[in-house]
Amino acid sequence: EAGSAAYKAPETEMETLLSDIWQEVLGLDQIGVSDNFFTLGGDSIKGIQMASRLNQHGYKLEMKDLFQHPTIEELVSYVERTEGKQADQGPVEGEADLTPIQRWFFERNFTDKHHWNQSVMLHAKDGFDPEITEKTLHVLTVHHDALRMIYREQKPYYRGLEDASVELNVFELNGPAEDHEDRIEREADRLQSSISLETGHLLKAGLFRAEDGDHLLLAIHHLVVDGVSWRILLEDFTSVYTQLKQGDEPALPPKTHSFAEFAERIKEYANTKAFLKEADYWRELEEKEVCTQLPKDRQSGDQRMRHTRMVSFSLTPEQTEQLMTNVHEAYHTEMNDILLTALGLALKEWTGEDTIGVHLEGHGREDILDGLNITRTVGWFTSMYPMILEMKHADDLSYQLKQMKEDIRHIPNKGVGYGILRYVTAPEHKENLSFEIDPDISFNYLGQFNEMSDSGLFTRSGMPSGQSLSPDTEKPNALDIVGFIENGQMTMTFAYHSLEFHEKTIQSFSDSFKGHLLKIIDHCLAQDGPELTPSDLGDDDLTLDELDKLMEIL
């Protein structure tokens, strides 16, 4: 297998359980106890999925232990029996608190804030049974409480189970297939724009029935869903639909702690002495001289989404496989270390600057709250925080990669605290912070999407899913870069404001990013053996230069 050492079979019960779970999550046939989770293609989101499955067997694992001990033989001693009471399995009802990212959403006061969704269009060549589909969505809305939320005057409210039914809008597509696309797009746009935050439902579903199979649109307001949530929902949709079709009473894994409980615990955590130590890191970041503005081709006061255009590139399956596996052996890196180095090199080439600010987005489900398990919880947990890409060593790729890796490791709790400080912590605890750093560019690596191909029930439809975001809502950033892996290929998309950038400008930047990424892949594959950095040794005070001198002496 890619990234494997010589195969060493699991021996104990726990080693076998971990090996089975890794095989399921990573889609591999054989995993030994000395194989590295990350060089097998794992990432932090795969780590969450692994922890979720482990939890279903009555065990827990903290993500930091997976990152520090990424082989089964090392990790096995860090797996613990789940203690304390299981999450409440009853329905969540009544008022709740906003999470930091939800507070960001309402602070921005977007136009058409009701039309700010995430969506997916599924295709089943054998069709979806409308009655089973509607029942499946009902089961999901009962189980995943966030899907029953509404927002009145920016206050979250969970409705009861009597409001868990979801209406499935069914459209019969007659006539030639080439005419279907326009109708699907028209009806999908209508469904996407019909969500009401005040009255709900925040989930809309449309079933388009055609001779070549059915297309199912699921649109959910972003306030209650994120990338990890979609993985959970698609997995559960497949499971419940299949059980109902077989005539079984549908069963799902136990609920993990609720989105409401997460928001409540964050409120308490935000003013604790242990957490407030993070403020020093963000204050130092704010004090640095940094380039946050991209060189625009022209200026525009019109920031509406309708002016967004996109360019993208994809790597070959072979390049993607290397990027997911062997590349990380050279410097013990993770995906973001590589992608952000390529981004920084391309930005330096474009702006001529050495120190460049970007907004980073992460899944936000970090292990910061003791005893809280949110591995199978649906909600909007995303973290959003500024990072400074230091590109002074761009001419020395080895040093630059190691520097980027160390800079990322120094971000406390993967940046989740920035939003907590900004939106939840009491004013007297953050007087030295301005929260004014506002880069033009945002970056988000979403991980791997295998739920479509693994399902057996559906694939991603090629039909239009309508506009997830209102064309009249404001674009938060001038340039949004999103990366993901689907069907074995890495794709990077560049969504830009067309009144500020020419297409050729962004195409040139995309080409530069891809070129640097391929150079990094080649560089890492050409290294003789792994090279350690201070974070590998667990030493926060040791610098790269000091470690290099030590290694020379040794």
Predicted regions and their residues:
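Hydrophobic (often cysteine-bearing) scaffold residues that line and stabilize catalytic clefts
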Residues: P10-L18, D129-P130, H180, I184, ...
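His-Asp-centered acyl/peptidyl-transfer active-site segments
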Residues: P91-V92, F110-N117, D145-A146, A188, ...
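Acyl-group handoff/entry surfaces in thioester-processing enzymes
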Residues: R53-N55, G90-E162, E167, A177-Y269, ...
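A short N-terminal helical cap/helix-turn-helix that marks the beginning
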Residues: L26, D65-P70, V79-K85, L147-Y151, ...
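Gly/Ser/Thr-rich phosphate-binding loops and adjoining beta-strand/alpha-helix segments
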Residues: Q30-D35, I48, S52, E93-A96, ...
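Regions immediately C-terminal to embedded phosphopantetheine-bearing carrier domains
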Residues: E1-H114, E131, K135, E181-D182, ...
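Extended, hydrophobic beta-loop-alpha segments that form or line the acyl/peptidyl-thioester binding
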Residues: K60-K64, H144, R148, L234-F237, ...
